[in-house]
Amino acid sequence: EKVDPPDVPRDDHVDETRLHADDAEALLEYYRNNADDRVRYSRDHALLALAWYTGARLGGLRSLDIEDYNQDEEYIQFTHTPDQDTPLKNGRDGERIVGLPSHICDILDGYIANERHEVYDDYGREPLLASQLGRVSKNGLRAWMYLATVPCLHSDCPHGNERPTCDFVDYSEASKCPSSRSPHQVRTGSITWQLNRGVPPQVVADRVNTSVRVIKRHYDQPTKLEEMRERRQDHLDSLDFEDEGGDGE
Protein backbone atom coordinates (compact mmCIF):
# COMPACT_ATOMS: atom_id res chain seq x y z
CA GLU A 1 0.00 0.00 0.00
CA LYS A 2 1.31 3.40 -0.97
CA VAL A 3 2.05 5.67 1.97
CA ASP A 4 2.18 9.41 1.47
CA PRO A 5 5.30 11.02 2.92
CA PRO A 6 4.79 13.20 5.98
CA ASP A 7 4.33 16.90 5.46
CA VAL A 8 7.66 18.06 6.86
CA PRO A 9 7.90 21.78 7.59
CA ARG A 10 10.23 23.67 5.28
CA ASP A 11 12.52 24.63 8.17
CA ASP A 12 13.22 20.93 8.81
CA HIS A 13 14.62 20.47 5.31
CA VAL A 14 17.18 23.25 5.10
CA ASP A 15 19.29 25.65 7.10
CA GLU A 16 18.02 29.02 5.97
CA THR A 17 20.97 30.96 7.40
CA ARG A 18 22.57 32.88 4.56
CA LEU A 19 24.22 36.14 3.65
CA HIS A 20 21.30 38.27 2.55
CA ALA A 21 21.62 40.42 -0.54
CA ASP A 22 21.30 43.71 1.36
CA ASP A 23 24.15 42.73 3.67
CA ALA A 24 26.29 41.51 0.78
CA GLU A 25 25.73 44.78 -1.06
CA ALA A 26 26.65 46.82 2.02
CA LEU A 27 29.81 44.79 2.61
CA LEU A 28 30.93 44.97 -1.01
CA GLU A 29 30.26 48.71 -1.13
CA TYR A 30 32.33 49.16 2.04
CA TYR A 31 35.30 47.46 0.41
CA ARG A 32 34.83 48.93 -3.07
CA ASN A 33 34.42 52.55 -1.93
CA ASN A 34 37.14 52.48 0.72
CA ALA A 35 39.73 55.21 0.25
CA ASP A 36 42.45 52.90 1.53
CA ASP A 37 43.67 50.69 -1.32
CA ARG A 38 44.83 48.13 1.25
CA VAL A 39 41.16 47.60 2.09
CA ARG A 40 39.77 48.11 -1.40
CA TYR A 41 42.11 45.50 -2.88
CA SER A 42 42.33 43.31 0.19
CA ARG A 43 42.22 39.55 0.27
CA ASP A 44 38.92 39.73 2.15
CA HIS A 45 37.36 41.83 -0.60
CA ALA A 46 38.65 39.54 -3.34
CA LEU A 47 37.37 36.47 -1.48
CA LEU A 48 33.90 37.86 -0.78
CA ALA A 49 33.49 39.26 -4.30
CA LEU A 50 34.50 35.97 -5.90
CA ALA A 51 32.29 33.95 -3.59
CA TRP A 52 29.26 36.19 -4.09
CA TYR A 53 29.45 36.54 -7.86
CA THR A 54 30.32 32.89 -8.59
CA GLY A 55 28.38 31.13 -5.81
CA ALA A 56 31.31 28.71 -5.59
CA ARG A 57 31.85 26.20 -2.81
CA LEU A 58 34.68 26.54 -0.32
CA GLY A 59 36.71 23.86 -2.10
CA GLY A 60 36.28 25.58 -5.43
CA LEU A 61 37.46 28.92 -4.09
CA ARG A 62 40.45 27.29 -2.43
CA SER A 63 41.40 25.48 -5.65
CA LEU A 64 41.85 28.63 -7.72
CA ASP A 65 45.26 29.57 -9.07
CA ILE A 66 46.31 32.86 -10.61
CA GLU A 67 46.35 31.18 -14.02
CA ASP A 68 42.68 30.23 -13.57
CA TYR A 69 41.77 33.90 -13.79
CA ASN A 70 41.56 35.30 -17.32
CA GLN A 71 41.82 39.06 -17.10
CA ASP A 72 41.17 39.73 -20.78
CA GLU A 73 38.17 37.43 -21.19
CA GLU A 74 36.89 38.20 -17.66
CA TYR A 75 36.29 34.71 -16.34
CA ILE A 76 37.47 32.31 -13.67
CA GLN A 77 38.03 28.60 -14.31
CA PHE A 78 37.49 25.82 -11.77
CA THR A 79 39.63 22.70 -12.27
CA HIS A 80 39.54 19.37 -10.43
CA THR A 81 43.09 18.45 -9.34
CA PRO A 82 42.75 15.86 -6.55
CA ASP A 83 46.36 14.67 -6.74
CA GLN A 84 47.48 18.19 -5.79
CA ASP A 85 45.10 18.71 -2.86
CA THR A 86 42.52 20.77 -4.75
CA PRO A 87 39.60 18.48 -5.58
CA LEU A 88 36.19 19.78 -6.58
CA LYS A 89 33.13 18.29 -4.90
CA ASN A 90 31.72 16.86 -8.13
CA GLY A 91 35.07 15.85 -9.59
CA ARG A 92 35.51 16.44 -13.32
CA ASP A 93 31.82 17.29 -13.51
CA GLY A 94 32.61 20.28 -11.32
CA GLU A 95 35.00 21.81 -13.82
CA ARG A 96 33.60 24.94 -15.40
CA ILE A 97 34.29 28.47 -16.59
CA VAL A 98 32.33 31.26 -14.89
CA GLY A 99 32.09 34.77 -16.30
CA LEU A 100 32.80 37.73 -14.02
CA PRO A 101 31.52 41.32 -14.15
CA SER A 102 34.13 43.90 -15.11
CA HIS A 103 34.09 45.56 -11.69
CA ILE A 104 34.93 42.25 -10.02
CA CYS A 105 37.86 41.83 -12.39
CA ASP A 106 39.05 45.30 -11.36
CA ILE A 107 39.08 44.11 -7.76
CA LEU A 108 40.99 40.95 -8.61
CA ASP A 109 43.50 42.91 -10.69
CA GLY A 110 44.16 45.28 -7.80
CA TYR A 111 44.39 42.45 -5.29
CA ILE A 112 46.88 40.48 -7.40
CA ALA A 113 49.01 43.55 -8.10
CA ASN A 114 49.06 44.99 -4.60
CA GLU A 115 47.97 42.68 -1.81
CA ARG A 116 48.37 39.04 -2.80
CA HIS A 117 51.29 37.21 -1.22
CA GLU A 118 53.69 36.09 -3.96
CA VAL A 119 53.93 32.46 -2.88
CA TYR A 120 53.62 28.95 -4.28
CA ASP A 121 51.94 25.88 -2.85
CA ASP A 122 53.59 22.50 -2.30
CA TYR A 123 53.10 21.64 -5.99
CA GLY A 124 54.64 24.77 -7.45
CA ARG A 125 51.28 26.36 -8.23
CA GLU A 126 50.38 29.98 -7.47
CA PRO A 127 47.16 30.03 -5.42
CA LEU A 128 44.94 33.00 -6.15
CA LEU A 129 43.72 33.31 -2.56
CA ALA A 130 47.11 32.92 -0.94
CA SER A 131 48.25 32.94 2.66
CA GLN A 132 51.76 33.96 3.65
CA LEU A 133 52.77 30.30 3.52
CA GLY A 134 51.09 29.21 0.29
CA ARG A 135 47.64 27.73 -0.31
CA VAL A 136 45.27 28.38 2.53
CA SER A 137 43.65 25.44 4.33
CA LYS A 138 39.90 24.94 4.25
CA ASN A 139 39.60 26.04 7.86
CA GLY A 140 41.75 29.07 7.14
CA LEU A 141 39.62 30.13 4.20
CA ARG A 142 36.50 29.62 6.28
CA ALA A 143 37.95 31.91 8.96
CA TRP A 144 38.78 34.53 6.33
CA MET A 145 35.16 34.55 5.19
CA TYR A 146 33.81 34.96 8.69
CA LEU A 147 36.13 37.93 9.18
CA ALA A 148 35.21 39.43 5.79
CA THR A 149 31.49 39.43 6.63
CA VAL A 150 31.29 40.91 10.14
CA PRO A 151 28.58 43.59 9.84
CA CYS A 152 30.39 46.29 11.81
CA LEU A 153 32.58 46.84 8.76
CA HIS A 154 29.76 48.81 7.14
CA SER A 155 27.34 49.81 9.91
CA ASP A 156 26.77 49.87 13.65
CA CYS A 157 26.96 46.51 15.35
CA PRO A 158 23.49 44.91 15.39
CA HIS A 159 24.41 43.20 18.66
CA GLY A 160 25.27 46.31 20.67
CA ASN A 161 29.04 45.87 20.66
CA GLU A 162 31.70 48.48 19.95
CA ARG A 163 34.20 47.48 17.26
CA PRO A 164 37.35 48.60 19.17
CA THR A 165 36.49 46.29 22.06
CA CYS A 166 34.61 43.50 20.27
CA ASP A 167 36.28 40.10 20.30
CA PHE A 168 34.51 39.07 17.09
CA VAL A 169 36.66 41.29 14.85
CA ASP A 170 39.66 39.06 15.55
CA TYR A 171 40.60 36.40 12.97
CA SER A 172 40.18 33.55 15.44
CA GLU A 173 36.90 34.82 16.90
CA ALA A 174 34.96 36.14 13.88
CA SER A 175 33.08 32.86 13.47
CA LYS A 176 31.39 33.53 16.82
CA CYS A 177 29.78 36.75 15.61
CA PRO A 178 26.07 35.98 15.18
CA SER A 179 25.99 37.94 11.92
CA SER A 180 29.20 36.76 10.23
CA ARG A 181 28.76 34.13 7.53
CA SER A 182 30.54 30.98 6.36
CA PRO A 183 31.43 30.27 2.72
CA HIS A 184 28.42 27.95 2.45
CA GLN A 185 26.09 30.65 3.78
CA VAL A 186 27.54 33.13 1.27
CA ARG A 187 26.96 30.56 -1.48
CA THR A 188 23.36 30.08 -0.36
CA GLY A 189 22.75 33.83 -0.36
CA SER A 190 24.41 34.23 -3.75
CA ILE A 191 22.31 31.56 -5.41
CA THR A 192 19.10 33.01 -3.99
CA TRP A 193 20.15 36.50 -5.11
CA GLN A 194 20.96 35.34 -8.64
CA LEU A 195 17.54 33.71 -8.90
CA ASN A 196 15.82 36.81 -7.54
CA ARG A 197 17.67 38.92 -10.11
CA GLY A 198 15.98 36.89 -12.83
CA VAL A 199 18.86 34.67 -13.87
CA PRO A 200 17.28 31.42 -15.18
CA PRO A 201 17.62 28.48 -12.76
CA GLN A 202 19.53 26.40 -15.31
CA VAL A 203 22.07 29.19 -15.83
CA VAL A 204 22.51 29.57 -12.08
CA ALA A 205 22.87 25.81 -11.72
CA ASP A 206 25.59 25.74 -14.37
CA ARG A 207 27.47 28.63 -12.76
CA VAL A 208 27.45 27.15 -9.26
CA ASN A 209 27.77 23.50 -10.31
CA THR A 210 24.59 21.96 -9.03
CA SER A 211 21.22 20.86 -10.42
CA VAL A 212 18.03 22.84 -10.80
CA ARG A 213 16.34 20.33 -8.49
CA VAL A 214 18.88 20.96 -5.74
CA ILE A 215 18.58 24.71 -6.20
CA LYS A 216 14.81 24.59 -5.82
CA ARG A 217 14.99 22.39 -2.75
CA HIS A 218 17.93 23.84 -0.86
CA TYR A 219 18.78 27.30 -2.13
CA ASP A 220 15.71 29.01 -3.54
CA GLN A 221 14.64 30.39 -0.18
CA PRO A 222 12.80 33.67 -0.56
CA THR A 223 12.00 35.64 2.57
CA LYS A 224 8.38 36.31 3.50
CA LEU A 225 8.70 39.76 1.92
CA GLU A 226 10.14 38.26 -1.26
CA GLU A 227 7.34 35.70 -1.36
CA MET A 228 4.76 38.48 -0.98
CA ARG A 229 6.34 40.44 -3.81
CA GLU A 230 6.23 37.38 -6.04
CA ARG A 231 2.56 36.74 -5.21
CA ARG A 232 1.75 40.38 -5.81
CA GLN A 233 3.51 40.41 -9.16
CA ASP A 234 1.74 37.26 -10.34
CA HIS A 235 -1.74 37.72 -8.94
CA LEU A 236 -2.48 41.21 -7.60
CA ASP A 237 -3.75 42.48 -10.93
CA SER A 238 -6.50 39.84 -10.74
CA LEU A 239 -7.79 41.24 -7.44
CA ASP A 240 -9.68 44.17 -8.92
CA PHE A 241 -13.49 44.48 -9.19
CA GLU A 242 -13.19 46.86 -12.12
CA ASP A 243 -11.67 44.13 -14.29
CA GLU A 244 -14.64 41.78 -13.87
CA GLY A 245 -16.82 41.19 -16.92
CA GLY A 246 -20.53 42.00 -17.10
CA ASP A 247 -22.60 44.69 -15.37
CA GLY A 248 -22.37 43.18 -11.91
CA GLU A 249 -26.04 41.97 -11.83
Residue ranges and their predicted role:
Residues E1-D4, R57-G59, C152:
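N-terminal DNA-binding recognition helix of tyrosine site-specific recombinases/integrases
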Residues E1-E29:
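Flexible interdomain linker/hinge and immediately adjacent N-terminus
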Residues A21, E25-L58, D93, Y123:
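Basic, Lys/Arg- and aromatic-enriched nucleic-acid-binding interface segment
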Residues S63-G110, H117-V119:
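Conserved tyrosine-mediated DNA breakage-rejoining catalytic core shared by Y-recombinases
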Residues C105-W144, D156-C166:
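Major-groove DNA-contacting interfaces characterized by cationic-aromatic clusters
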Residues A143-D206, R213, Q221:
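Short, basic (Lys/Arg/His-rich) helix/loop patches that form interaction surfaces
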Residues V208-Q233:
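Catalytic-site neighborhood detector that most strongly recognizes the C-terminal catalytic loop/helix
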Residues D234-E249:
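C-terminal secondary-structure termini that scaffold catalytic or DNA-interacting sites
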